Regions:
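Thiamine diphosphate
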Residues: 1-82, 85-345, 352-354, 405, ...
Length: 529
C-alpha cells in the first residue's frame, strides 16, 4: 500500500502534466481536452481525500505542517502558527519564470484597466434629428433606437466601435437594413443561399460583418455583449455594443450574467426593444414584460430608462456615450423601447436635464388640481386622461418619467446626505423640487406597481400608483390596458377618486363621473385572475 501511495496521480505529477500540455499545444486541427486525475485536498495530510473537505473551515496545525513538509515550504515550527505569506526571492527561478512567461502573454492577470482611450462624442446631428416632431408620421421608440444605431455606424470617429447584437429578432426590430449596410459577422462567411437572397435587404453573412446575430441564445448573445462591453479594460480598446432583445427575455433569463457584467464594470447599451406588459401583445403571456426595470434596479451600476418619445431616446443615448466613453464613468445602460407606433412631439426646450435625471414636464396648467405621471407607452394614456379630466373642469399637469429607478437613487442619496449633515439646510430630492405643489399624483406605467412605488417617500400629497401586476391576457393593447387598469379611463378614475378624498368633488359629482366612465366595482383584481 505504501508503495502504491507513492505513485503520483497524473494530475499531481509535474512530468505527466507537462507531457500532456506539450502534446495538447502541438496538436493541430481540433481542440484538446486533458483529463487529470487528482486527489481532493491534496497535500493536507489527514484531510486528503476526505468527503467532508468542503465543510472544513480551517486546518489543524498538524495538517498545515504536513502541507508545509509535502511542498517544501520554508516556514519554521516557531512561525507556522502565524500562517505567514511565503514569497520566493525576486531572483529565484520561480519568480523569474513567472515574470518571463506573463510578459510573453501580454502582462499579469487578473488586471483591470479603470481608464482607457477616451472617445469623442459623435456629431450632434445624429441626435438632433430625433429632437424634432415626427409630424403626422407615426413611429415607435424601437424605430428611433435603430435609426440612432444606423447613424452611429456611419460616424467616422465612432463607427468602428459600434456593434449591434441580436439573439434572433433582427427583423422584428426593423434592423434588416443593417444586413446590407454592415453585414452579419460569420467566421466562415456565407455558406448557404438565404431564403431571401432575391430581396434588397437579404440575410448577408460575411467574414468582415459587424452585426452579431447569435440565434436563439440569450446567454450567448449577452456573453458577446459582455466581451465587447469590457474591451476597454481588457484590450484598452473601448467598444460600444448595443444588444437588442425582447425585454422579457433579458434580465428574466440572464440576470446572473447581467450581475457579472456589472461587477466587471461593463459599459454599453442593453435595449429591451419590445417592452411593456400591455404593449407587446398577442404573442403569449411569457413575452409580456412588466418587471424588467425592477430586475435592473438590483444592479448598482445599471442606469435604466423607460422613454416614451424619440427625443428622450436620443438624449439618453447621447448622455450614455458621454458618461461611459468620454468621461469614462463605470455604468451600463438599460433602455426599454416599444413597438407601438404613434406621433412623437418635438422636444420641449431645456428638457435634457430632466430626461437624464428621470422626469420632465410635458403638459402644464396654471392651476392644476391633479398631477399625472407616466412612462413609456402608458404616458399617452396619461395625456388622454388629462383631456378627459378637462371635460369635467379638472385641470391637470402631465410629467414624463423616464426613470423611476434613478428618481429613487436620487432620493436615497439626498436622504443620506441629510442624515449625515443634520445641522445643514435640508436638501430636497429631485422629485420634491419638481413637485412643489402638494396635489394628488397619479402614476401609471406598463410595469408592476412597485416600479412607480419607489418614489412614494418623496411625494407630499396623495400618491396613487397604477401598474400591470399579474399575468394578464393575450389580447389587444386596448383590452389589456383596460384589464390591468392603466388606460386613460382608469387613470381618470384614480384622479377623480383622489380629488374626492380631498373633498374637491362632491358625492354627486363622483357618482356622475364614475357612471360615465363605466366603472365596474365588481371587477376582479387583475393580479388574481
Amino acid at each position: 500500500d505504501e508503495d502504491i501511495y507513492k505513485l503520483n496521480r497524473g494530475g499531481h505529477d509535474p512530468y505527466k502534466v507537462y507531457a500532456a500540455y506539450h502534446k495538447a499545444v502541438n496538436s493541430k486541427g481540433a481542440p484538446t481536452v486533458i483529463l487529470a486525475l487528482t486527489t481532493k485536498g491534496y497535500g493536507t495530510g489527514s484531510r486528503e481525500a476526505d468527503n467532508t473537505t468542503h465543510q472544513v473551515k480551517k486546518l489543524s496545525i498538524e495538517n498545515i505542517k504536513s502541507f508545509r513538509d509535502r511542498f517544501d515550504i520554508p516556514v519554521s515550527d516557531s512561525e507556522i502558527e502565524e500562517l505567514p505569506y511565503v514569497r520566493p526571492p525576486e531572483d529565484s527561478p520561480e519568480i523569474q519564470y513567472l515574470k518571463k512567461t506573463r510578459k510573453a502573454l501580454g502582462g499579469f492577470i487578473p488586471r483591470r484597466r479603470t481608464t482607457s482611450e477616451a472617445l469623442k462624442l459623435p456629431d450632434n446631428s445624429i441626435f438632433e434629428k430625433l429632437y424634432e416632431s415626427s409630424g403626422d408620421r407615426k413611429i415607435s421608440t424601437t424605430m428611433a433606437i435603430v435609426r440612432i444605431i444606423t447613424e452611429l455606424l456611419k460616424d467616422k470617429e465612432l463607427g468602428e466601435r459600434i456593434v449591434p447584437i441580436v439573439p434572433d429578432e433582427a427583423r422584428t426590430f426593423g434592423m434588416e437594413a443593417l444586413f446590407r449596410q454592415v453585414g452579419i459577422y460569420s467566421s466562415a462567411g456565407q455558406k448557404y443561399e438565404p431564403e431571401d437572397a432575391d430581396k434588397v435587404m437579404w440575410y448577408k453573412e460575411s467574414k468582415d460583418g459587424v452585426m452579431l446575430e447569435e440565434g436563439i441564445t440569450e446567454a450567448g448573445a449577452f456573453s458577446a455583449w459582455t466581451a465587447l462591453a469590457t474591451a476597454y479594460s481588457n484590450y484598452d480598446f473601448p467598444m460600444i455594443p448595443f444588444y437588442l432583445f425582447y425585454s422579457m427575455f433579458g434580465f428574466q433569463r440572464v440576470h446572473d450574467l447581467s450581475w457579472a457584467a456589472g461587477d466587471a464594470q461593463a459599459k454599453g447599451f442593453l435595449i429591451g426593444a419590445t417592452s411593456g406588459r400591455t404593449t407587446l401583445n398577442g404573442e403569449g403571456l411569457q413575452h409580456q414584460d412588466g418587471h424588467s426595470h425592477i430586475l435592473s434596479s438590483t444592479i448598482p451600476n445599471c442606469l435604466s430608462y423607460d422613454p416614451a418619445y424619440a427625443y428622450e431616446v436620443a438624449v439618453i443615448i447621447k448622455d450614455g456615450i458621454q458618461k461611459m466613453y468620454v468621461e469614462q464613468e463605470n455604468y451600463f445602460y438599460y433602455i426599454t423601447t416599444i413597438n407601438e407606433n404613434y406621433k412623437h412631439p418635438e422636444m420641449p426646450k431645456g428638457a435634457e436635464e430632466g430626461i437624464i435625471k428621470g422626469m420632465h414636464k410635458i403638459k402644464t396648467s396654471d392651476k392644476p388640481s391633479v398631477r399625472l405621471i407616466g412612462s413609456g407607452a402608458i404616458l399617452n394614456e396619461s395625456l388622454k386622461a388629462s383631456e378627459i379630466l378637462k371635460k369635467y373642469n379638472i385641470e391637470s399637469e402631465v410629467w414624463s418619467v423616464t426613470s423611476f429607478n434613478l428618481l429613487r437613487k436620487d432620493g436615497m442619496e439626498v436622504e443620506r446626505q441629510n442624515q449625515l449633515n443634520p445641522l445643514n439646510k435640508k436638501k430636497l430630492t429631485y422629485v420634491e423640487e419638481c413637485f412643489e405643489e402638494s396635489i394628488p399624483t397619479i402614476a401609471a406605467t406598463d410595469y408592476m406597481r412597485s416600479y412607480a412605488e419607489q418614489i412614494r417617500p418623496y411625494i407630499s400629497g396623495q400618491y396613487i400608483t397604477l401598474g400591470t401586476d399579474g399575468y394578464g391576457r393575450s389580447d389587444s393593447r386596448e383590452t389589456l390596458r383596460d384589464f390591468f387598469e392603466v388606460d386613460a379611463d382608469s387613470i381618470t378614475r384614480a384622479a377623480v377618486f383622489a380629488l374626492f378624498q380631498e373633498k374637491y368633488l362632491s358625492k354627486d359629482e363622483i357618482e356622475k363621473i364614475y357612471k360615465e366612465l363605466k366603472v365596474d366595482s365588481a371587477k376582479p383584481n387583475p393580479w388574481e385572475v
